[in-house]
Amino acid sequence: RYYSHRFYSFQAAAISENANTQSEQGVMLRVEAKPWEGVNIVSYVDFFADYWPRYGMTTSSNGQEFMLEGKFEMPHSHLLSLRYQMKRKAANDVILPLHRIKAQWTFTGFEKCKLQSTASVHLSSGTNPGFAVSQLAQASILRNRALRLSFVGAYFNAPDYLTRVYIYEPSLWNSSASYSYYGHGLRIATGISYTFPHSHWIIEAKYSLTHMLDRHTISSGHQEILSSNKNDISIQIRMEY
């Protein structure tokens, strides 16, 4: 896993820790099995090493990661997903194990509607666990699914950055859709996308609100918000051929 300092790609991904294009030594073994109809099991183990000090480190470091996930298709368009992930990675010259457990239920029984419920727990030594629960709803209406709507509501409680939780939410085209949170708060995001008929034009908009329950300010320095609420509005207009 070697990349020259002159290498750059806007949306590059690689088989490495966090899928980043970073120079490191590593070996990964991945196994996928379908023992029964409607059951899919995936597991991998990854060993990685950095011979140069990473951010927050003063020496070289190494780590291991293990993941086991099972997906179970059920009658009437129900899908249950269970995942366990363990990572041992050095931080501040100390190796700390991190455990992540995630359960997700998805319902696609309606032709143009999707419901998804997610619960996750993150555990680490020496700190309280972090957890999050979220509910996603998506719908497509009008002819040829020209109008698409989405909504996400989430509650999270993670004591520090080490046990931060990740929440997926539909986002604008070509932008990030998974965000990390720590602290105690609520997250709401809603989006709309419309494709003009007989045209190449598409307009998308997203509104999101983060409400913190454990503080009266958000961020710090020049980006400090003197409120427990953070509002974001994004609009995108694009033309496709």
Regions found by a protein language model. Give the residues of each.
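Exposed, low-structure sequence patches enriched in small/polar residues
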Residues: R1-Y241
